[in-house]
Amino acid sequence: MNKRDLPWVALIAVSFMFGLAVSWERWGNPLVDCGREMNQPLRLARDQMLYSDVRHIYGPLSPYFNALLYKIFGPSLAVLYADGIVSALLILALVYWLSRRLMGPVPSAAATLSVMWLCAFKQAGNYILPYSYSALHGCALGLASLALLVRFVERRDASRSTSNQDVITAGVSPSSRLGNVSLVLAGAAAGLAMLAKTEMGLAAVSAGVVAVALAGYPNVRRTISLGAKFVVPAAVLVLGVYGYILSRVGWQTLAEDSLLFFRHLPPELVYFNKRVSGFDQPLQSITQMIGAAVRVGSVAAIIATVSLLLTRRKRDVVPARLSLADLSVSDAGRASYGQIWLLLAASLLVFVLIPLAGVLNWEKGPYLAMPLLLVGLMGLEFNRYRKQSNEGALNSQTIIVLVVTVYALASLARVILRVRSGGAYSSYLLPASVILFTYAWVHPFAAMFREDKTRRAARNIAVGLILADVVLTAGLLSYRYRDKNTYMLKTDRGTMLAVPDLGEAMNEAIGFIKRETGDAEPVAVMPEGTSLNFFTGRPNPLREEITTPGYLDREGEERAIRQLLESNTRLVLVTNRATSEFGPKVFGRDYCQTLMQWIEQNFDESAILGPDHDPNQQIGDKTFFIRAYRKREPGADGSEPVAAILPRSSMQK
C-alpha cells in the first residue's frame, strides 16, 4: 500500500463513522440471541463453568473473552459494543489488505465498503452486537489466518527470488524465516478461529493446507515440513483447550450434550440447518443458484456491450461473415453495432425476467451464485498455476487467489446451496466471497477484452456499479435503522434502541422484575429473552440461555423443572417468540409441553407486559408481549404440593 491508498482508506473510515452514527445503539435485538450474548459471559464471570453449568453449542473462546472483559470493565452493553466495533474494524482492515494483494485501491475500497454495508451494518447479523460473538470472532480470526497465509506465500516468493539472484551466501534467507513465522502464526489464528466457531476454523485450516501444498510443490519433504509448521500450533491450541474442558465437564457434556462436534443433532436443529443450507429443497436451491448465475452473466453481457459501444469508433465494422475463431469474447469488438445492440437488449431482457419467475421463488441477490463462481474461478486459476509451474515461472498471486478461493468456498459450506446476502449468519461468511466477487469483475472479466480502453471501461463500469450498490444499501439501512428502532430502552447496564412494541414490553418487564423479586433472586425467561436477566442483575436458574426447539428434550425439561425447584424460582416469563424456523412454532404447545404444563400447574398468570395487555394474546401474534407467571404457594387454595406433581421420572430421580 502507498499514498494512492490514503484517500480510499479515508473514505472507508468516514463511511464507518457514518454507519456508527446512523445506527448508534440500534444494533441489537434484546429478544433473539442477544440475551445469550449478554448474560452468558456474566455467568462465567461469576465462576460458573461453560458447557456444564451454562450450556453452549459453540467454541469456548468468545464467552470467556467477554467474561474477561466484564471482569475488567464491568458488565455493560458498552463493553459488548466496544468488542463489536473493534472486531468490525479488524475485519474491514483485513478485507482491504487482502483486496490490495489482488487489486488496486479503487476496487479494494469497493470490496471493503461492500463488506461494511452488506455485513458489518446489516440489521440482522451486524458486527457491533451480533447474534453470536463466536461467529464474529471466528470471522475475524479466520481472515487473520488467511492474511498470514497470504503473507507466507509472498515471503516464500521473495525468498525464491533472492536465492535465484545468489544474494544469500549461507543459511536461510530472512524472507524465508519471516515466511515460516507467518505460517506458524496463521496456524495459531486458525486454531483460535476453531475455538470460536468450529466451521470457521475449518475454513482457515482448509486454506492453510492448500497454501502449504501449492507453496511446497513438487518437493514432498518441504511440503510436509511446512504443513507441520501450520498444523501443529492449531492442533496444540484446540486439543489443549478442549482437553482441559473435557477434564472438567466430561465427554458426554462436551461432545454430545453441547452439540459442539455436530453429534446427535436434534431433529429441530437438523431442520433449521437444512433450511439455512438449502438442502431442505435441493433441486429448487440448485435451480435458483443457476438462475442467479445466469443473471450475473446477463450483467456481464450488459457491461461488455456498453463498454464496446463506448470505446468503439463507428467506422470499425467487420465483414458480414466471421470465422469461428472471430466469435470469441476477446474479438467481440469486431462485431457490428447492430449485433452489439441486440446482445445488449437480450441481456437486459434476461436480467429483468429471471427474478420475475415467481413459481421458482427466485432469490435476487448475486451471491446466491457464489459457489458456482468460486468453482469457476478456482478452475481458471488452477489451470494458470499448472501452466506457470510447468514453465518454471510461478506467480505468487496465482497461489494467493487459489488460497483465498478455497477459504471463501469452505466458509460457505454451511449455506452452500443458499448463499443469501440477507439473514443473520451470512454476514460472517461472505467477506472473502465479496473480495473475490469484486476481483472477478476487475481481472478475469476485464481481461477478456483485447483492447486496453475497452478493458478499462468494463472494469470502471463494474466497480462503479458495486459502489452504486454500496450507496443504495447504505441509504436503505440508514433509513431502516432510524425508522424502525425508535424506542429507547434505558437500563442499569446500558441503553439500546429497539422497535417500539419490543422495547415497551422489555421496559415493562424490567420494572416488573425489580418490583416482584429481590436483587439476587432467580428469574426464568423462556424460550428467549435472558437479556432481562442481564439488565436486572437477576440470575438465570436454568442451564440454558435459550430454550427454543431442539435444546430441551424430555430429560432436559425434567432437569429444568428440578432447577426451578431447587433455586426456588418464583417468577417465570414466557416471551412471544414464534420459532417456525425450527419447525415447532409455539413454546408449550408444539415443544416443551412437559415444562409448560408444570409451570401452569405451579404458577399463576400474573401479568401481560407490552403495549397490549389483552390476556388472550397468543405466541405468534404480531404485537410483542411477555406473559408473567408468579409461583403459587404450595398447598394454597387446595392445590397439591409442588413436588407431588413433578413428572414421574423426576420423582424417581
Language-model region placement:
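Membrane-interface transmembrane helices that cradle and orient dolichyl/undecaprenyl
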Residues: G142-L185, P218, A292-T311, L324, ...
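Extracytoplasmic catalytic/substrate-binding loops of multi-pass membrane glycan-assembly enzymes
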Residues: E25-Q40, L50-L68, P75-A78, V249-W251, ...
